[in-house]
């Protein structure tokens, strides 16, 4: 059952326990397995990818079957309803519109003495998107990862996703990928997919940036290949924290908590409220909705282990506790969310008001749903167009400008014991004289 505790209890310790839920001893064993997979794929390429696809996904493939064919992509449209296709297209438009507003612009400043300074943004050459399989068809993951890459101007976007029964990929995932400009799709999942994207194989291209969520093996693989390639983040299990007052609908709050818990047995769903009656009513509503929940086993585990209701003294106290937890998703189900918002410093995405469930942001509001988890919102942000961009500094000095700063550069280079640095300026000054 969903627990209710008061602020006087050791709330911070309980929140820390939930935040640290992925830091168990088994991770070390899993990391050793992942290292083995990475090295095998790096050395053996397709052969290792096919071996691990058989071992972990129970699908026997040939190298030529790794890439999804054009006929499969065409057939996927026949298997998707008109309603779903229209929903994908609506979500795509809104996500793209939001991300186009956030594209950083290159700039150049012309200063005194013909000094030119600036910053130039350019996309990576190749982006690799990972889309999980397993519990659901993650259509929204395709959109949220591919669209920022497309908006950034990445010329080659490839996707990896694990094969299901009979080597099939969910048709909705294939349709979504085509709608947003993914050029290549490979049926490979897990750590072997991350390795293939990071190192390249005979069939799968090496990319520059890998994005997308996955299980602990995928996350560890991304951690270990970072440096060889860029990554978006190290995402843990999903989480929602809801701050609610007496005006919130307990059935809605309960549903929002279950919407998070149904993701994964390790997902976290937390409620902070000032109203004891709401706390009790949410507890009851959660139990009622669990009875016939289609994903009851996993959802019930998440609620039992990582679900929590905390009675707080005030909304200010709730905001401060929320900042310490730094949730991936934060819902402000209060009468005046804009009054609470200034007190929120750390959250991946913030949903304001009684009519803004997290699902709006998950699917089609526009902001990205790939968010920092496990407290990382203290220092990290959502996936964005900038994930797929680099920026280069632009610097040009005239001879006049160089003459004016030569002494300062000489002093700094001499202090650091780097004589050739100083000479590189001195000789240009002497040449000018």
Curated annotation (Swiss-Prot):
Cofactor note: Binds 1 zinc ion per subunit.
E.C. no: 1.1.1.23
InterPro entries named among the record's database cross-references: Ald_DH/histidinol_DH, Histidinol_DH_CS, Histidinol_DH_monofunct, Hstdl_DH
Sequence intervals crossing the membrane: none
Names of the cofactor(s): Zn(2+)
Annotated NAD(+) binding sites: 130, 192, 215
Single GO cellular component term: cytosol
A GO MF label: zinc ion binding
Pathway: Amino-acid biosynthesis; L-histidine biosynthesis; L-histidine from 5-phospho-alpha-D-ribose 1-diphosphate: step 9/9
Residues annotated for substrate binding in this entry: 238, 260, 263, 329, 362, 416, 421
Catalytic function, reaction form: L-histidinol + 2 NAD(+) + H2O = L-histidine + 2 NADH + 3 H(+)
Entry-linked Pfam families: Histidinol_dh (PF00815)
CDD domains from the UniProt entry: Histidinol_dh
Gene Ontology biological process: L-histidine biosynthetic process
Domain of life: Bacteria
Record-annotated active site: 328-329
Assigned keywords, A-Z: Amino-acid biosynthesis, Histidine biosynthesis, Metal-binding, NAD, Oxidoreductase, Zinc
Sequence positions that bind Zn(2+): 260, 263, 362, 421
Root EC class: oxidoreductase
Summary of the function given for this chain in its UniProt record: Catalyzes the sequential NAD-dependent oxidations of L-histidinol to L-histidinaldehyde and then to L-histidine.
Family: Belongs to the histidinol dehydrogenase family.
Name used for this protein in its record: Histidinol dehydrogenase 2
Gene name for this UniProt entry: hisD2
């Amino acid at each position: 059952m969903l627990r209710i505790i008061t602020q006087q209890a050791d709330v911070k310790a309980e929140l820390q326990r939930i935040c640290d839920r992925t830091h168990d001893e088994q991770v070390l064993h899993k990391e050793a397995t992942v290292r083995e997979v990475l090295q095998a794929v790096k050395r053996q390429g397709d052969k290792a990818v096919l071996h691990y696809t058989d071992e972990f996904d129970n699908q026997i493939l040939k190298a030529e079957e790794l890439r999804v064919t054009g006929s499969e992509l065409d057939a996927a449209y026949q298997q998707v309803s008109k309603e779903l296709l229209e929903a994908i297209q609506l979500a795509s438009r809104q996500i793209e519109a939001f991300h186009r507003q956030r594209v950083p612009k290159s700039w150049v400043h012309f200063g005194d003495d013909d000094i030119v300074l600036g910053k130039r943004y350019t996309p990576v050459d190749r982006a690799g998107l990972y889309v999980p399989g397993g519990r659901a068809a993650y259509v929204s993951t395709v959109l949220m990862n591919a669209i920022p890459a497309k908006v950034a101007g990445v010329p080659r976007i490839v996707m990896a996703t694990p094969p299901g029964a009979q080597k099939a990929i969910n048709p909705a995932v294939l349709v979504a990928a085509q709608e947003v400009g993914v050029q290549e799709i490979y049926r490979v999942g897990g750590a072997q997919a991350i390795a293939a994207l990071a190192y390249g194989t005979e069939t799968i291209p090496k990319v520059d940036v890998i994005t997308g969520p996955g299980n602990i093996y995928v996350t560890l693989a991304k951690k270990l290949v970072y440096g060889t390639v860029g990554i978006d983040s190290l995402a843990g299990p999903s989480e929602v924290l809801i701050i609610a007052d007496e005006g919130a609908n307990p059935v809605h709050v309960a549903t929002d908590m279950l919407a998070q818990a149904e993701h994964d047995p390790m997902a976290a769903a937390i409620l902070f409220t000032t109203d004891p009656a709401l706390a009790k009513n949410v507890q009851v509503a959660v139990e009622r909705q669990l009875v016939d929940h289609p994903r009851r086993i996993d959802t019930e585990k998440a609620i039992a282990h990582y679900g929590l209701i905390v009675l707080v003294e005030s909304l200010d106290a709730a905001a401060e506790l929320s900042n310490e937890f730094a949730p991936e998703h934060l819902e402000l189900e209060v009468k005046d969310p804009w009054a609470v918002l200034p007190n929120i410093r750390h959250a991946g995405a913030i949903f304001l008001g009684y009519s803004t469930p997290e699902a709006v942001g998950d699917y089609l509001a526009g902001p990205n749903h790939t968010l920092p988890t496990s407290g990382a919102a203290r220092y990290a942000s959502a996936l964005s167009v900038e994930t797929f961009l680099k920026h280069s500094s632009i610097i040009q000095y005239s001879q006049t400008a160089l003459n004016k700063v030569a002494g300062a550069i000489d002093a700094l280079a001499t202090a650091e014991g780097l004589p050739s640095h100083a000479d590189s300026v001195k000789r240009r000054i002497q040449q000018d004289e």
